[in-house]
Regions:
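Phosphate-group recognition and catalysis centered on beta-loop-alpha active-site segments
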Residues: 1-225
């Protein structure tokens, strides 16, 4: 199972370190994937930040791309926070030689028409990996599976732990890779988190995105004996 460190968090949320090069490097060295957010300044430069911010030497995307190239087999989940520069983004990823590592997701939260961005991204680059969203907020499995260009399904449980084994098997039958958000990211207590981790593992989910990457790794090792 792939462990994806949410914004580079690995021992819980750490606002002073999350999304930092230091934290991400630690995660990549551990063999984990990472989830980060990419944004663009008005003059066309890219930076890594969950919230809109001011470009500086520490958050400039060039610095992160240099880091990622040192770990070419690691998976980077790239959350698109803005709409309208897809052509330039694909060019940027290709120029920095990290396209094979990343998959793009969360376009549905910002696009004016469902599936529009995934279709455009596929037209721009036949190899770029795309994830479609599924959640308990009017984002059903059937809709996500209708995005033919998406090889990955990104599962969210905002208000309820609603996913079942049948849901996972339905997605697997469609031959999609499945990554799930860990419950603590949406405020669920750790008791439910551990239970959900075990269920996801048993059901065959391919990866979990969590703020507790270190604990998830230890937990998986305990299951394996």
């Amino acid at each position: 199972m792939l462990i994806i460190a949410h914004r580079g968090n690995y021992k819980g949320v750490c606002p002073t370190k999350e999304n930092s090069v230091e934290a991400l490097r630690f995660c990549l060295e551990r063999g984990w994937g990472i989830e980060i957010d990419i944004r663009r300044t008005p003059n066309g430069e890219y930076y890594i930040s969950h919230d809109p911010s001011i470009l500086n030497k520490n958050n400039h995307a060039d610095v992160y791309c240099h880091l990622f190239r040192q770990y070419p087999d690691r998976i980077i989940a790239l959350n698109l926070k803005e709409f309208g520069y897809e052509i330039e983004l694909i060019e940027y990823l290709n120029k920095n030689n990290i396209t094979s590592q990343v998959f793009l997701f969360d376009m549905e939260l910002i696009e004016p028409e469902f599936g529009q961005t995934a279709k455009l991204l596929r037209q721009l680059d036949a190899e770029i990996k795309i994830a479609a969203r599924v959640s308990d907020r009017n984002e059903p499995i059937e809709r996500a599976l209708s995005i033919e260009s998406a090889s990955i399904i990104w599962l969210d449980e905002f208000d309820n732990l609603w996913l079942t084994n049948d849901d996972i098997q339905k997605i697997k039958e469609a031959r999609k890779v499945i990554y799930a958000i860990s419950p603590e990211i949406h405020g669920f207590p750790m008791g439910q988190v551990y239970q959900r981790w075990e269920q996801f593992y048993t059901w065959g989910v391919n990866g979990i995105c969590t703020d507790y990457a270190d604990e998830l790794e230890l937990t998986i090792k305990s299951w394996l004996g």
